[in-house]
């Protein structure tokens, strides 16, 4: 007689997670986390601004405004603005890392990779890219170098100042737009939809620059997408930080051309443009030239040949057992009389 199988008593199924408009599989939903992050940035910035205002008022110069004695892009002025941006976003992201129980480095700037090979390769690539864009304009007789602007000890100081400044620019802008925001939005809507959104925000942030044009803003958005591509393939922001710094350093300091319509100060070379705006970028500078999008596409193609694997760790929730996976256990009691 066949031995019957007796079903063992089964425990009740685990309670199904209760999701709300505020909480999802990853805890607090991505949109709310972004809003909390932005609120922290605004709150920290307001607090620092109030403290600075109090200090200035106590010194009896509440109505005074800082003046650096020059008009144009200076290492000091740029370092102050970009350093403030980096401080605000880094502190806000650190607070969010405590709330989310994540390492701060998950947001794109792991300390173990700081200023490593990817950063320096990216820096060299950024300098080559701006050089290629200007070379294209030169071939159409729209660009020429007219002389050397800075010499001697002043040149040495300018090299050090601009190098440090543009590393800070790369760190601040990459982390602000492609650090915590990119990571969190990826958890909510996927990597490339998040990349498109952060790149558009990157363009909007540059729209207020003096002399900016539609062509220049298009290039800024393309830069944002390219930097997201670097992040996707390398797994962190260090390649993008290097490329960003190398491009800006070459454009502003080395070649001495305008960046978003702002002329540089204590640059190495003097340069001049001649020709239609589509070729030279006009008052905006080479970022608004037709050659810049072409160069960025070439950079993306070459980069994809050397960095073939996607190393970006997608934010995912822990796997949860489903009721359908809980198969009933059976016990064979052996032959029955």
Task: Give the ranges of each region predicted by the language model.
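Membrane-interface helix caps and helix-loop-helix hairpins in membrane proteins
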Residues: 148, 205-214
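N-terminal, membrane-interfacial amphipathic/helix-forming hydrophobic leader that caps
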Residues: 1-104, 108, 252-337
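Juxtamembrane helix-loop-helix connectors linking adjacent transmembrane helices
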Residues: 52-80, 98-175, 182-187, 316, ...
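Functionally important transmembrane alpha-helices
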Residues: 216-277
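Membrane-interface helix/loop boundary segments of multi-pass membrane proteins
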Residues: 16, 172-197, 229-236
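Small-polar-interrupted transmembrane alpha-helices in polytopic inner-membrane proteins
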Residues: 130-131, 162, 166-167, 190-207, ...
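Membrane-embedded alpha-helical segments of multi-pass membrane proteins
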Residues: 83-88, 159-163, 217-222, 294
């Amino acid at each position: 007689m066949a031995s019957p199988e007796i079903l063992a008593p089964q425990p009740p199924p685990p309670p199904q997670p209760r999701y709300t408009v505020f909480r999802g599989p990853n805890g607090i939903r991505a949109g709310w986390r972004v809003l909390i992050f932005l609120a922290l940035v605004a709150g920290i910035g307001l607090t620092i601004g109030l403290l600075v205002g109090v200090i200035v008022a106590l010194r009896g110069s509440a109505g005074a405004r800082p003046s650096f004695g020059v008009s144009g892009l200076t290492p000091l002025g740029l370092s102050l603005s970009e350093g403030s941006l980096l401080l605000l976003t880094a502190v806000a992201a650190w607070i969010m890392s405590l709330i989310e129980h994540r390492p701060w480095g998950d947001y794109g700037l792991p300390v173990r990779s700081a200023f490593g090979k990817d950063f320096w390769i990216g820096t060299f690539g950024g300098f080559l890219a701006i050089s290629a864009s200007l070379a294209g304009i030169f071939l159409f007789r729209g660009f020429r170098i007219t002389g050397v602007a800075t010499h001697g000890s002043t040149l040495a100081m300018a090299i050090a100042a601009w190098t440090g400044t543009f590393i800070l620019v790369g760190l601040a802008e990459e982390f602000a737009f492609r650090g915590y925001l990119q990571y969190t939005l990826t958890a909510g809507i996927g990597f490339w939809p998040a990349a498109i959104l952060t790149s558009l925000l990157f363009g909007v942030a540059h729209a207020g620059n003096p002399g900016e044009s539609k062509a220049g803003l298009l290039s800024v958005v393309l830069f944002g997408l390219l930097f997201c591509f670097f992040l996707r393939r390398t797994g962190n922001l260090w390649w993008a930080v290097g490329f960003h710094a190398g491009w800006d350093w070459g454009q502003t300091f080395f070649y001495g051309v305008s960046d978003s319509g702002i002329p540089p100060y204590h640059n190495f070379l003097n340069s001049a443009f001649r020709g239609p705006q589509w070729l030279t970028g006009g008052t905006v500078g080479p970022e608004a030239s037709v050659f810049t999008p072409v160069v960025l596409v070439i950079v993306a193609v070459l980069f994809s040949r050397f960095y073939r694997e996607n190393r970006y760790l997608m934010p995912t929730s822990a796997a949860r057992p489903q009721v359908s996976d809980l198969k009933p256990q059976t016990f064979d009691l052996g032959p029955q009389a």
